[in-house]
UniProtKB/Swiss-Prot annotation:
PROSITE patterns: GIDA_1. Belongs to the MnmG family. It holds the Pfam family GIDA. It is found in: Cytoplasm. This is tRNA uridine 5-carboxymethylaminomethyl modification enzyme MnmG. GO terms for molecular function: flavin adenine dinucleotide binding. GO terms for biological process: tRNA methylation; tRNA wobble uridine modification. SMART domains: GIDA_assoc_3. Coiled coil: none annotated.
Length: 632
């Protein structure tokens, strides 16, 4: 049957990508449907119960700056918070939160169910109807047809999903859930470039069977961090400890002796697994010289005894899992509540995507999350937000934007998408700060300053968040002006206080603002001396802007040069064979990727600076010819 309501956006999948996509589209005013195989699993944390980490928290903050749900849900469910790299530079500091699975899922569901313009429907999607090269409807497992102007597909690991435990395998999207077989077959019929990837998860353990007394305690940070710009420590539930144990020589021997029973090493799994989150059998094989690996024992929540042993993801047979877990200190009597497993699934070459995450081959069909070859909740969520935003822009009038995608210098989201569509991926892609060439400008702490104004123009940021952002920016400007007006000299009261509190002897006069340039003086010192009343976030922004000013200015100069290339668009149907002087190899690479700008063309492996110059000259010449024809 035809469903009586027509939608602007239909989102398939209720994981981290799907929920952010649906919320973004609905916030912008699009009539949105979120189609999920099970309403009870909306926002499910299928693997580790944690949000954030190196590179990942930057993405979470960007989702938050654009009005998304992930960061606030983390503040409402986080049972341990830590700042990683806290002693390193501001660019690489990252917040990580251990989350209560049940509380996180509840927070996401509450947000979804209270979002205007958003309907939720429980049923699997079996087909996407395409007419004249454009997605027009989604068909469910029972034949219900939802007509729509755009489709966002966020299928996670469900497309053609196969679960492996030892040499036994079964079809599944994750443990306990059916895979999407018909939809996977349909996408293959549409001739989209498909591949197979693999990911895995460890066994879960009953905390009552664990001896924590022989493990290292890993407490959270004090004072407690927050994940969202709108978050507050008062939102946090009860805080708990994590623990650390280690594998040992016996553990490694057990695993090595059973590699022939591993689906990875026997050749049963064809898909490539995540390089930066390998299974324990892969770690022991690749790092044969190491006789021990850290294993983090992480609580799954406040109302469950289940533990997540981070670091022993595996697809070995259950009897082997039991044996190697029992070989570790503190886990000698551990009761396994769920076995670890690997899952193999379909993904589609992200080089077939536009920067908006719309497919190049089918109009108004957007992909987000693991279907694009990424791994991680944060990577999925930020893609979902981008895809949902651009799907909504197709249907909602916006005076500022026809489409939106951030550049590499604007957001880690821009880095992630550019990496995917330019280089593609043959293994699950994970974000790191090292992937961003402008990471000093793309800090976790300034995502709101980079993106919230854009989010407001897009319709993603509500009045409450916008007011909070404006108040913060006004406080930064006001406090900066105040500090610039306060002078310290070797003889005056302020100068003497500075020396007394910090040990820094003044040899000449300086403003309180300029004193922050000294490595040993921090905003907290100046705030105490000058009776500042601003909050820590404001002080942090002022201190970073002063201490890193020279480096930031140099990066900005690099960005200004790069923007000239970013502003030179390349038509999607550009004929690279007409560019005189390009080698056949470069022509083939450009034709395969179909870069949208000269800057993106320059990031393709093997495309030389000389080739970019030739391309720029040809584009300029063609523009002149076109202008002349239009004039006549």
């Amino acid at each position: 049957m035809q469903y009586p309501k027509n939608y602007d956006v239909v989102v398939i999948g209720g994981g981290h990508a799907g929920t952010e996509a649906a919320l973004a589209a609905a916030r912008m005013g699009a009539q949105t449907l979120l189609l999920t195989h099970n309403i009870e699993t909306l926002g499910q944390m299928s693997c580790n119960p944690a949000i954030g980490g190196i590179g990942k928290s930057h993405l979470v903050r960007e989702i938050d700056a654009l009005g998304g749900a992930m960061a606030l849900a983390t503040d409402k469910s986080g049972i341990q918070f830590r700042v990683l790299n806290s002693r390193k530079g501001a660019a690489v500091r990252a917040t990580r939160a251990q989350a209560d699975r049940i509380l996180y899922k509840a927070a996401i569901r509450h947000t979804l169910e209270n979002q205007p313009n958003l309907d939720i429907f429980q049923q699997a999607a079996d087909d996407i109807l395409v007419e004249n090269g454009r997605a027009t409807a989604v068909v469910t497992a029972t034949g219900i047809i939802f007509n729509t102007q755009t489709v966002v597909l966020t299928s996670g690991t469900f497309l053609g999903g196969v679960i492996h435990i030892g040499l036994e395998s079964s079809k599944g999207g994750r443990a306990g859930d059916q895979p999407s077989i018909k939809l996977a077959d349909r996408l293959r019929e549409l001739k989209l470039p498909v591949g197979r990837l693999k990911t895995g998860t460890p066994a879960r353990i009953d905390a009552r069977s664990v001896d924590f007394s022989v493990m290292t305690v890993q407490p959270g940070d004090t004072p407690l961090p927050v994940m969202s710009y709108m978050g507050d420590v008062s939102m946090h539930p009860e805080q708990v400890n994590c623990y650390i144990t280690h594998t040992n020589a016996r553990t490694h021997d057990i695993i090595r002796e059973n590699l022939d029973r591993s689906p990875m090493f026997s050749g049963k799994i064809e898909g490539v697994g995540p390089r930066y989150c390998p299974s324990i059998e892969d770690k022991i094989h690749r790092f044969a010289d190491k006789d021990s690996h850290q294993i983090f024992i992480e609580p799954e929540g406040l109302t469950t005894h289940e533990l997540y042993p981070n670091g022993i993801s595996t697809s070995l047979p259950f009897d082997v899992q039991l044996e190697f877990i029992h070989s570790m200190k503190g886990l000698e009597n551990a009761h396994i509540t769920r076995p670890g497993y690997a899952i193999e699934y379909d993904y589609f070459d992200p080089q077939n995507l536009k920067p908006t995450l719309e497919t190049k081959s089918i109009d108004r069909l957007y992909f987000a999350g693991q279907i694009n070859g990424t791994t991680g909740y944060e990577e999925a969520g930020v893609q979902g937000l981008l895809a949902g935003t651009n799907a909504a822009l197709v249907t909602c009038e916006n005076n500022e934007f026809d489409v939106w995608t951030p550049r590499r210098d604007e957001a880690y989201l821009g880095v992630l998408v550019d990496d995917l569509i330019t280089h593609g991926t043959t293994e699950p892609y994970r974000m790191f700060t090292s992937r961003a060439e402008y990471r000093l400008l793309l800090r976790e702490d300034n995502a709101d300053q980079r993106l919230t104004e854009t989010g407001r123009k897009l319709g993603l940021v509500d009045d409450v968040r916008w007011q909070a952002y404006e108040e913060k920016m006004e406080a930064i400007a006001s406090e900066t002006a105040r500090l610039k007006d306060m002078w310290a000299t070797p003889a005056n009261a302020l100068g003497k206080k500075v020396t007394e509190q910090t040990g820094e002897v003044l040899s000449k006069e300086a403003t309180a603002f300029d004193l922050l340039k000294r490595p040993q003086i921090h905003f907290a010192d100046i705030a105490a001396i000058t009776d500042s009343q601003v909050d820590a976030q404001v002080g942090e922004q002022i201190e970073i802007s002063v201490k890193y000013a020279g480096y930031i200015d140099r990066q900005q100069e690099d960005i200004d040069q790069m923007k000239r290339l970013e502003n030179t668009a390349l038509p999607i149907d550009f004929d690279y064979s007409v560019v005189s002087g390009l080698s056949n190899e470069i022509v083939q690479k450009l034709a395969q990727v179909r870069p949208s700008t000269l800057a993106q063309a320059g990031r393709i492996s093997g495309v030389t600076p000389a080739a970019i110059q030739l391309l720029a000259m040809t584009v300029k010449k063609q523009k002149k010819v076109k202008a002349a024809l239009n004039a006549s």
